[in-house]
């Protein structure tokens, strides 16, 4: 009986050790990749940087109007390129984009303004329904909670999280769109099948300080470098460690040099105490230096 108990403890410890190693490796991976992506993004001007939804509302409008415009921009953004969305928002603002103005439009006229936004006919209806709800139930403003925003027609979790961040200045979750979902899985940070599952997984993996910037960072990276089709793996700084890279051994025409990136992390160790069935957790800080091949300027 005693030996059997000992075997169980040893087996349990082994499983815990493997799990700890897996988590530690994933933490090192995403921290390394984020630093490399930030380095690449410094030289990129992506559509999201100049035409993202955070750029489309009138900064001089009254706060409730500004918040409504942020909401509208995000409602139009799904299945729509930033350039098309920005143009549609300009047309709406030229007509005076407010709750009252949206309610004055006839649906066919609103459709004409929104076209060629993706699903513009459906979104025209959503906009009018949302405007009526905001007028009747929110005194002409937008909800200030995630649940309240998600209850509006045509508003999902990604939009709601971005509205909270942009309009209310509050980050309550990670906004996961197709770029964030694709890239975080390509890099091997997580293994998920839907954006909703990706959000939950990333919110466990990433510290809250990264929840807001990760969307903008990965969206721009996905637009310019890690595209859905034919990603530019040959010039990506993550290509040597990315499990999805098609160019792990590809050298650029310029000379390669080495760059060391120090990744700081806290790792929680779990071990068995001498007393049976008593576990102790300790936190230790580690530093990992990762050498990544990058390209020097000629």
From Swiss-Prot:
Catalytic activity: 2'-deoxyribonucleotide-(2'-deoxyribose 5'-phosphate)-2'-deoxyribonucleotide-DNA = a 3'-end 2'-deoxyribonucleotide-(2,3-dehydro-2,3-deoxyribose 5'-phosphate)-DNA + a 5'-end 5'-phospho-2'-deoxyribonucleoside-DNA + H(+)
Knockout consequences: Increases the total average mutation rate 17-fold. No significant abnormality in lifespan or sensitivity to oxidizing agents such as hydrogen peroxide and methyl viologen (MV); due to the redundancy with other DNA glycosylases.
InterPro entries with a match to the protein in the record: DNA_glycosylase (IPR011257), Endonuclease-III-like_CS2 (IPR004036), Endouclease-III_FeS-bd_BS (IPR004035), HhH-GPD_domain (IPR003265), HhH_base_excis_C (IPR023170), HhH_motif (IPR000445), NTH1 (IPR030841)
Disordered: annotated segments: 249-298
Binding-site list for [4Fe-4S] cluster: 226, 233, 236, 242
Annotated CDD domains: ENDO3c
Family: Belongs to the Nth/MutY family.
Keywords: 4Fe-4S, DNA damage, DNA repair, Glycosidase, Hydrolase, Iron, Iron-sulfur, Lyase, Metal-binding, Mitochondrion, Nucleus
The species this protein was found in: Caenorhabditis elegans
Record's protein name: Endonuclease III homolog
Biological-process GO terms, alphabetical: base-excision repair, AP site formation; cellular response to hydrogen peroxide; depyrimidination; DNA repair; nucleotide-excision repair
Temperature dependency: Optimum temperature is 26 degrees Celsius.
HAMAP family on file: Endonuclease_III_Nth
């Amino acid at each position: 009986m005693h030996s059997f108990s000992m075997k169980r403890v040893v087996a349990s410890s082994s499983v815990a050790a493997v799990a700890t190693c897996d988590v530690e490796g994933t933490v090192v991976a995403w921290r390394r990749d984020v630093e490399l992506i930030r380095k690449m993004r410094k030289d990129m001007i992506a559509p999201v940087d100049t035409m993202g939804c955070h750029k489309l509302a009138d900064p001089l409008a009254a706060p409730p109007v500004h918040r409504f415009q942020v909401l509208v921009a995000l409602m139009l953004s799904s299945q729509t390129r930033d350039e098309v969305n920005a143009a549609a928002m300009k047309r709406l603002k030229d007509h005076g984009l407010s709750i009252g103005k949206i309610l004055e439009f006839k649906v066919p006229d609103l459709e004409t303004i929104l076209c060629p936004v993706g699903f513009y006919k459906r979104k025209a209806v959503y906009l009018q329904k949302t405007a009526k709800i905001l007028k009747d139930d929110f005194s002409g403003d937008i909800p200030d909670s995630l649940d309240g925003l998600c209850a509006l027609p045509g508003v999902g979790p990604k939009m709601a999280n971005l509205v909270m961040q942009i309009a209310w200045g509050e980050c309550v979750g990670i906004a996961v769109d197709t770029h964030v979902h694709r890239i975080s899985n390509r890099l091997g940070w997580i293994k998920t099948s839907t954006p909703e599952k990706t959000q939950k997984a990333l919110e466990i993996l990433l510290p809250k300080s990264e929840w807001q910037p990760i969307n903008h960072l990965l969206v721009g990276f996905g637009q310019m470098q890690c595209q859905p089709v034919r990603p530019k793996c040959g010039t990506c700084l993550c290509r040597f460690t990315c499990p999805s890279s098609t160019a792990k051994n590809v050298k650029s025409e310029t000379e390669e040099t080495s760059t060391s990136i120090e990744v700081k992390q806290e790792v929680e160790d779990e071990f068995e105490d001498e007393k049976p069935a008593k576990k102790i957790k300790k936190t230790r800080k580690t530093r990992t230096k990762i050498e990544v091949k990058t390209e020097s300027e000629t």
